Amino acid sequence: MRIAILGGTYNPVHVGHMFLAKEIEHFLNVDKILFIPTHKPVHKCVENISVKDRIAMLKLAVQHENNMFIDECDIINGGITYTVDTIACIRNKYVHDDIYLVIGDDLFESFDSWKNPEKIIDSVNLVVVHRIYSERLVSRFKHTYIDNRIFSISSSEIRSRIEQGLPVDYLLPFDVLQYIKSNNLYVKGK
């Protein structure tokens, strides 16, 4: 089986994440896509939103997709989890499968400073997706590049819009938007 893994905070999950998953499914011809929400990201602060809420929103986003699943290995491990540890967890479950680690070019830029990047490369097929750079990044690490220029929206931008009272309709899966509204998430002063 061919499995793509997409890690992130998903704070909140948005249409850019979902469209990217569909692009990965198409271009890599994968059988399964695993969304892996981080418990506590190494380089980000998860502001005032519980892990429970982030998982609930992700479940709503993938509920109608037959080959998209959530793996909570980073949540179960707790604390800060490094990608190399996440991959070891996934490898234990999918020993004989082809695993594709999908990361944005913004993260790929510093890939050589990650914990055990060589071990990551030895364990998975690295896929780099265009996010911010106009040119492809050069690297000593073997990777496949996907030019995904459709959605340049970010979770932080969506949080900011909600905090400012600006519309976010159509930037989020409908059920995720309803969850955010029902639970009063990302509202200024909360």
UniProtKB/Swiss-Prot annotation:
CDD domains xref list: NMNAT (cd02165)
Record key words, sorted: ATP-binding, NAD, Nucleotide-binding, Nucleotidyltransferase, Pyridine nucleotide biosynthesis, Transferase
BP GO terms, sorted: NAD biosynthetic process
Reaction catalyzed: nicotinate beta-D-ribonucleotide + ATP + H(+) = deamido-NAD(+) + diphosphate
Domain of life: Bacteria
Keyword check for Nucleotidyltransferase: yes
Enzyme class at the top of the EC tree: transferase
Involved pathway(s): Cofactor biosynthesis; NAD(+) biosynthesis; deamido-NAD(+) from nicotinate D-ribonucleotide: step 1/1
Family statement drawn from the similarity comment of this UniProt entry: Belongs to the NadD family.
Function in brief: Catalyzes the reversible adenylation of nicotinate mononucleotide (NaMN) to nicotinic acid adenine dinucleotide (NaAD).
Classification via PANTHER family: NICOTINATE-NUCLEOTIDE ADENYLYLTRANSFERASE-RELATED, PHOSPHOPANTETHEINE ADENYLYLTRANSFERASE
Full protein name: Probable nicotinate-nucleotide adenylyltransferase
The species this protein was found in: Borrelia turicatae (strain 91E135)
Upper lineage: Bacteria, Pseudomonadati, Spirochaetota, Spirochaetia, Spirochaetales
